[in-house]
Amino acid sequence: MSLKPYATPTYWQRVKVAFQYIFPQLPVTRLAGWLAEQKWGAVTHFIIRTFAKQYKVNLSEAQKSNASDYATFNEFFIRPLKENARPINQDAQALCLPADGKVSESGKIEDDRLLQAKGHFFTLETLLANDQEMANKFKDGHFITTYLSPRDYHRVHMPCDATLRKMIYVPGELFSVNPFLAEHVPNLFARNERVICEFETEFGPMVQILVGATITASMSTVWAGIINPPRTKEVVEYHYETSGETAVHLKKGQEMGAFRLGSTVINLFPKDSVEFEAHLQAGVETRMGERLAKIK
């Protein structure tokens, strides 16, 4: 885990951070979700074309490559890609990256502490909704945090073959999760709304977390559909059988969830279970399916 020097924020940076605390996160997120589901024909197509141009979205790799092919903005945002647009690493001893985006941080979990960004840490226990039993499984393990920008493909995939054990919906704030705010809002990922998914794998437990953000109107999984809305005020746990007809088995590279706008994915691995690719440091671009780590 690389430690970077912490720079004192400028006046305008402090203003930008302060604005996040007074910004009406939930009403704006609800409005964004409603707008993104509207079927406005030519208006919707114009918005999609403008967005794609502004953020340099590569529509040529999508199954629907024309803005006019999408009925709603959300349909465009969670667009599926063409077959083989993201080849999955076929090494049986390799894990693959779960999402397109950039590495926010990665490295070793120091006891129970994860590096959020320059000088900011958060704990496993707070990230995992005070589930101490789950947190203990990942002490001194490894983590990688992937930030998905507006231009990125927003479906999330499995890094390895796995069986679902537990899902936890955690209500929370809806701070933006861009790299600047990750450096300036303490405990950002442990404060924001999130969906925690715990899996069993051949190398032990693994957790994949979908973290919400401002205007992330909803998060979904392939086994449960849209998790939010509705948004509850309490933590909600779902437990799953790991064998039998109702068990949820997912293959490496298989889709497991999606963001309707936003956000961030965090992966946790147990101590001495995997070895990350050396180049996966903060700021490095990621493409779903490429090599993440090898199983020890």
UniProtKB/Swiss-Prot annotation:
Q: Into which family does the record put it?
A: Belongs to the phosphatidylserine decarboxylase family. PSD-B subfamily. Prokaryotic type I sub-subfamily.
Taxonomic path: Bacteria, Pseudomonadati, Pseudomonadota, Gammaproteobacteria, Pasteurellales
A Gene Ontology BP annotation from the UniProt entry: phosphatidylethanolamine biosynthetic process
Q: What class of enzyme is it?
A: lyase
| Record's keyword terms, sorted | Cell membrane, Decarboxylase, Lipid biosynthesis, Lipid metabolism, Lyase, Membrane, Phospholipid biosynthesis, Phospholipid metabolism, Pyruvate, Zymogen
What catalytic reaction does the record list?
Answer: a 1,2-diacyl-sn-glycero-3-phospho-L-serine + H(+) = a 1,2-diacyl-sn-glycero-3-phosphoethanolamine + CO2
What is the protein's quaternary organization? Heterodimer of a large membrane-associated beta subunit and a small pyruvoyl-containing alpha subunit.
Where, per UniProt, does this protein localize?
Cell membrane
In terms of InterPro entries, this protein maps to: PS_Dcarbxylase, PSD-B, PSD_type1_pro
Give residue numbers for the modification (Pyruvic acid (Ser)).
S263
Instruction: State the EC number(s).
Output: 4.1.1.65
Highest taxon of the source? Answer: Bacteria
Q: Which GO terms describe its cellular component?
A: plasma membrane
What is the name of this protein?
Answer: Phosphatidylserine decarboxylase proenzyme
- Site Cleavage (non-hydrolytic): give positions: G262, S263
**Pathway(s) this gene product operates in, as recorded in its UniProt entry:** Phospholipid metabolism; phosphatidylethanolamine biosynthesis; phosphatidylethanolamine from CDP-diacylglycerol: step 2/2
Q: Which residues form the active site?
A: D100, H157, S263
Q: What does this protein do?
A: Catalyzes the formation of phosphatidylethanolamine (PtdEtn) from phosphatidylserine (PtdSer).
Summarize the PTM comment: Is synthesized initially as an inactive proenzyme. Formation of the active enzyme involves a self-maturation process in which the active site pyruvoyl group is generated from an internal serine residue via an autocatalytic post-translational modification. Two non-identical subunits are generated from the proenzyme in this reaction, and the pyruvate is formed at the N-terminus of the alpha chain, which is derived from the carboxyl end of the proenzyme.
Q: Name one GO molecular function term.
A: phosphatidylserine decarboxylase activity
Instruction: Give the cofactor note text.
Output: Binds 1 pyruvoyl group covalently per subunit.
**Pfam families from the entry?**
PS_Dcarbxylase
Topological relation to the membrane, as annotated: Peripheral membrane protein
- This protein's major location comes to membrane
Which cofactor is recorded for it? pyruvate
